[in-house]
Amino acid sequence: MAETVVLSKILHIRETEKKHAQKAYQQSIDLFEKTATQLYELLKKKEMAEEVYETALTESTTLDKLKEQFTYIEHLNNHIMHLQEEVQKARFDMEAKQSKLTDAHVEMKKYEKIIETRKKDEAAANRKKEKATMDEVSIYQFLNHKNR
């Protein structure tokens, strides 16, 4: 019984670790989604800017407007490259935290299984002991009854 109490305390610690890992994983998912959404919005802006630039090329537009639009597109490209790196980092972090969460879950399940097995063994030992006691009582009663 004392063994299962100790194991239950360890299980509680593992459950706490799992909750922390789950929270960290959720935060990493949120960060990834936020960064990916920013990248998506920036890609949409770039696409629209390129359409405006292409339209400006076909129409009679001043050279300054074309340079300005081209510079804007280059600025967007630089920002997109930076955000792509951020998305990759966020994805890597998210995958690492998912792995930690999986490991924490497996550890927790191990202790649950060990506790379950120990309790079953304990119950079987108690039943065996109870049966032996009942057999002993029956023999004692039989012998007492026979001696009368």
Across the structure, where does each feature detected by a protein language model lie?
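Charge-rich amphipathic alpha-helical interaction elements
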Residues: 1-148
